[in-house]
């Protein structure tokens, strides 16, 4: 991942700041420089916050990132654009905050865009899904990104010197090694469960074996004493239990068959004798009933004679019945005709009475008409009596209210005139207040500027004084440096190179003779004496070293002085002081006070006028309201007067009660008249209708009476003829025959029942005689007792068979269950044996006394150390390498780091390193960790890295080595940014991102050296 642009709003000291990382060339090393607290580390916080919603270090919380100078309505937000795997993305993350005037936080926002065809397209717009998208895109979580992207202050020194427990916590987060410990825990729990399950299976076998039935056999009972672990012997004894049970079952089944046959014979005998006994009893009873039936023969013969007579006189009886009915009808018709005559006379009398009553009612018609007209005319008033009463009651109240309103209205008019007179010479003037405000602002600005000028002048004078002092020191140090360089130049250095070659010269001398050719210069040797003064050369060499050392020291002092002078110049430029004419601040303050007084006086007048205008407005509003109220009340009064006048004019009453009494009386008179008139007319109509009906009924009755008399005469002639033929002498004989005819159905029914019963008894007696013919009856009680005894014997045998069968089946089921459990147990023991062993190994019971997670973490740590040593060897001049301390102990061992010193050929504790050496080891370890985390996170490549502080502890040579390491790192394809205050880095690093602060807001700018 390579940063391209970042925009920070209300983020730390940055109110609205944009950094363009594209100004950093590919593979370029750059320095981030600025005062302490200017916000250098906040740049890293902004990048990490944009990606993961958190700061670059764990100690900073999201709420700590918001600028204290941000306004209450603007959110904290970061827009971060970067490139990863040749794809360009942009993230806009906005933090939640409590907006000014609210009590709840706003919602966090996150939008992720991808650059496609030179346009950004939205990929995610929800916070949770967006966070997951970023983790999947980069392949690392926030903690891993911190280790890869940023090397924070002191973090890797802590990691280098930490114990195994602390390292485990860090490495566990980076490499997600907790899953290995979870595997171990799962395996341990699995083993525990399996052991419990195996014990449960043995318990199941024991319980099932104890439940096996022995059929009261002593030999089988001995087998029950086998232990649950003796599974092979159990399986061997299973068939013996089954064979013995089947043998007992067979003997009981044979006995059952014998008893069943005996019982069937007894049941058959009992059934035959029960039927014989019942048939004998039934035959005797049927004979008795048949004899009783024969005794009714005479009565049945008499009924047959009566039936014959009824059938022969059927026509005569019909004539007689019809004649009796006609005579009865004739009597009723005579009675009805007489009653109708009487009714006709009564109806005529009633009609005359109601006609007289109707004539009397017609005399009041004019009076009732006048009442009706009055009622119609005043019905509206009668229906609204409550409203009219209310009008009479409201009228004096409204008149009093109008009087009160006129009084208050006049009071308000008077008050308004008094206020107008009081404020006659007072006016509002906001323009003059604005003028005073502008003048006050200008004076305050001049006073503030004068005070600032005074402070700047004082600071400028101090800077000039300090600068002059440092320039004097610089001049002095440069003179000292020139003197030293002159001294070094004046020393004869021609033979200095021979200082360490005395032994070499003596060896050559011992091998040469006078007259030989010199192997160095090629001339003839004339003498072998001492031509070189090695002691003098050594003295000169020591003097040069002292001077060089002093020279380096003075140069360092010169660099520090120049840095201080440069800093003073920078501060002087920032101050940008120019001498100006001094102004009298006390006089300006007097003018300011006078203007404030004038402003306050005019504000008081404005306030007084505003108060008057407010009161005047209230009075005008009240007057207007009184006008409305008076108009409304007068309107109400007019409506009431109109309503009262209408009532009195139409009703001719000034009293509502009198009107109500008269109206009710008139209404009652009309209603009574109309009711009586209508009732009389209805009664006359009803009587006339009844009279017509009665006269019509008389006509029909006369006709029916004539017809009935004629039919009676005809029937009497027919009856006399029929009586002569049948031998009847009187109507009494005919009446007796008619009475007997009514019983015909009952006579026929009795005869039929007798005949049917007679035939049925004959058939049943013959059938029963055949059934009992030639058979002997046995003792039923003795047979029943024999059957009961045999049934008890059979039930007992069946119970024994069922019990034995159940025991055999139950034993068989338990045997099968035991076999299944034994098979499962054997399979589990084969598999779990290896799992038990693996569980112990992963739990630390091994030669290395390491758990699985610690073993994995050691693997990662050794990879990190291998990567770190490639750089540490270079930085330490092949002197140091990191090694893992190997110690065998159960627990969190094996993660401590020692350092191996090739000069002493021994390893030593990491704390024995100096500050600079510790920085070298920490930097190497950090870079190594970064490499390994990248490899383990799916090969994601972070094309950038930032290092925060740590270089101040290094000497010049070590610093150069560290810078070379970082230069090699950036040349491998990374953009490397360094935060540091070390001045040598400013000289060595060509590109600087300067962070400047003006007390409350910071700004950034790239600058090239």
From Swiss-Prot:
GO molecular function, one term: ATP hydrolysis activity
Gene3D superfamilies recorded: P-loop containing nucleotide triphosphate hydrolases
InterPro entries membership: P-loop_NTPase (IPR027417), Rad50/SbcC_AAA (IPR038729), SbcCD_Nuclease_C (IPR053380)
GO process terms (BP): DNA recombination; DNA replication; double-strand break repair
Residues that, per the record, bind ATP: 34-41
Alphabetical keyword list: ATP-binding, Coiled coil, DNA recombination, DNA replication, Endonuclease, Exonuclease, Hydrolase, Nuclease, Nucleotide-binding
Pfam families: AAA_23 (PF13476), SbcC_Walker_B (PF13558)
Functional description taken from the UniProt entry: SbcCD cleaves DNA hairpin structures. These structures can inhibit DNA replication and are intermediates in certain DNA recombination reactions. The complex acts as a 3'->5' double strand exonuclease that can open hairpins. It also has a 5' single-strand endonuclease activity.
Description of how the protein assembles with itself and partners: Heterodimer of SbcC and SbcD.
NCBIfam families: sbcc_Staph
Protein's name according to its UniProt entry: Nuclease SbcCD subunit C
């Amino acid at each position: 991942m390579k940063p391209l642009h970042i925009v920070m709003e209300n983020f730390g000291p940055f109110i609205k700041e944009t950094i363009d990382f594209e100004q950093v060339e590919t593979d370029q090393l750059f320095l981030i420089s600025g005062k302490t607290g200017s916000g250098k580390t906040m740049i890293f916080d902004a990048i990490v916050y944009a990606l993961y919603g958190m700061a670059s270090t764990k100690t900073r919380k999201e709420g700590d990132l918001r600028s204290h100078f941000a306004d209450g309505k603007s959110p904290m937000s970061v827009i971060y654009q970067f490139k990863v795997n040749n794809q360009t993305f942009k993230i806009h993350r906005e933090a939640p905050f409590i907006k000014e005037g609210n009590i709840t936080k706003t919602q966090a926002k996150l939008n992720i865009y991808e650059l496609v065809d030179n346009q950004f397209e939205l990929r995610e717009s929800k916070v949770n899904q967006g966070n997951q998208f970023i983790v999947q895109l980069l392949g690392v979580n926030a903690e891993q990104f911190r280790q890869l992207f940023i090397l924070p202050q002191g973090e890797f020194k802590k990691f280098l010197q930490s114990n195994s427990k602390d390292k485990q916590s860090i490495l566990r987060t980076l490499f997600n090694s907790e899953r290995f410990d979870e595997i171990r825990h799962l395996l341990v729990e699995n083993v525990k469960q399996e052991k419990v399950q195996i014990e449960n299976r043995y318990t199941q076998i024991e319980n099932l074996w104890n439940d096996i039935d022995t059929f009261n056999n002593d030999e089988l009972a001995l087998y029950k004493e086998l232990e649950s672990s003796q599974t092979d012997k159990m399986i061997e004894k299973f068939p013996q239990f089954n064979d013995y049970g089947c043998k007992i079952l067979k003997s009981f089944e044979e006995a059952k068959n014998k008893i069943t046959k005996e019982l069937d014979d007894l049941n058959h005998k009992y059934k035959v004798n029960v039927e014989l006994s019942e048939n004998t009893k039934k035959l005797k009873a049927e004979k008795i009933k048949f004899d009783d039936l024969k005794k009714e023969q005479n009565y049945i013969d008499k009924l047959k004679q009566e039936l014959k007579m009824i059938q022969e006189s059927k026509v005569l009886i019909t004539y007689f019945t019809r004649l009796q009915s006609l005579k009865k009808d004739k009597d009723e018709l005579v009675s009805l005709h007489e009653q109708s005559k009487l009714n006709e006379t009564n109806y005529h009398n009633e009609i005359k009475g109601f006609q007289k009553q109707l004539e009397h009612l017609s005399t009041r018609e004019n009076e009732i008409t006048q009442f009706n007209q009055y009622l119609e005319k005043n019905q509206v008033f009668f229906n609204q009596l409550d409203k009219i009463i209310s009008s009479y009651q409201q009228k004096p109240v409204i008149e009093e209210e109008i009087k009160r309103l006129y009084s208050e209205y006049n009071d308000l008019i008077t008050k308004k005139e008094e206020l107008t007179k009081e404020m006659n010479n007072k006016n509002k003037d906001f323009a003059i207040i604005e003028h005073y405000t502008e003048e006050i602002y200008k004076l305050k600005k001049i006073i503030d500027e004068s005070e600032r000028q005074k402070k700047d002048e004082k600071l400028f004078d101090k800077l000039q004084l300090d600068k002059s002092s440092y320039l004097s020191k610089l001049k002095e140090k440069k003179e000292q440096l020139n003197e030293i360089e002159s001294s070094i130049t004046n020393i004869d250095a021609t033979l200095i190179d021979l200082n360490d070659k005395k032994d070499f010269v003596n060896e050559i001398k011992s091998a040469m003779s006078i007259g030989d050719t010199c192997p160095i210069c090629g001339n003839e040797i004339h003498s072998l004496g001492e031509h070189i003064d090695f002691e003098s050369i050594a003295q000169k060499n020591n003097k040069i070293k002292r001077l060089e050392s002093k020279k380096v020291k003075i140069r360092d002092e010169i660099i520090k002085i120049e840095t201080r002078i440069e800093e003073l110049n920078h501060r002087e430029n920032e101050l940008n002081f120019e001498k100006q004419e001094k102004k009298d601040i006390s006089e300006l303050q007097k003018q300011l006070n006078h203007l404030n007084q004038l402003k306050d006086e005019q504000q008081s007048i404005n306030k007084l006028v505003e108060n008057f205008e407010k009161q005047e407005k209230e009075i005008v509003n009240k007057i207007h309201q009184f006008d409305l109220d008076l108009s409304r009340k007068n309107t109400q009064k007019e409506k009431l007067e109109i309503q009262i006048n209408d009532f009195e004019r139409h009703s001719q009453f000034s009293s509502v009660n009198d009107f109500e009494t008269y109206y009710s009386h008139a209404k009652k008179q009309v209603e009574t008249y109309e009711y009586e008139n209508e009732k009389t007319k209805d009664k006359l109509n009803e009587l006339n209708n009844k009279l017509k009906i009665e006269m019509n009924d008389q006509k029909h009755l006369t006709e029916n009476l004539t017809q009935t008399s004629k039919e009676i005469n005809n029937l009497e002639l027919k009856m006399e003829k029929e009586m002569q033929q049948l031998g009847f002498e009187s109507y009494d004989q005919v009446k007796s025959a008619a009475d007997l005819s009514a019983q015909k159905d009952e006579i026929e029914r009795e005869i039929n029942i007798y005949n049917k019963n007679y035939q049925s008894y004959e058939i049943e007696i013959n059938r029963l005689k055949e059934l009992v013919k030639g058979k002997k009856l046995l003792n039923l009680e003795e047979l029943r007792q024999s059957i009961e005894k045999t049934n008890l014997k059979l039930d007992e045998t069946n119970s024994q068979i069922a019990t034995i069968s159940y025991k055999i089946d139950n034993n068989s089921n338990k045997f099968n269950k035991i076999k299944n459990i034994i098979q499962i147990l054997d399979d589990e023991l084969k598999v779990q044996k290896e799992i038990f062993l693996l569980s112990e190994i992963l739990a630390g019971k091994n030669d290395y006394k390491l758990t699985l997670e610690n073993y994995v973490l050691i693997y990662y740590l050794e990879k990190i150390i291998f990567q770190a040593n490639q750089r540490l060897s270079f930085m330490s001049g092949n002197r140091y390498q990191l090694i893992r301390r190997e110690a065998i102990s159960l627990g969190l061992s094996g993660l401590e780091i020692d350092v191996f010193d090739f000069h002493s050929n021994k390893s030593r504790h990491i704390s024995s390193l100096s500050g600079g050496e510790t920085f070298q080891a920490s930097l190497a370890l950090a870079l190594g960790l970064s490499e390994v985390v990248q490899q383990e996170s799916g090969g994601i490549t972070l094309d950038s890295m930032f290092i925060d502080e740590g270089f101040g502890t290094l000497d010049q040579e070590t610093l150069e080595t560290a810078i070379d390491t970082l230069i090699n790192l950036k040349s491998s394809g990374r953009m490397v940014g360094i935060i540091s205050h070390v001045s040598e880095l400013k000289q060595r690093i060509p590109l600087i991102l300067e962070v400047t602060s003006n007390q409350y807001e910071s700004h950034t700018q790239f600058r090239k050296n």
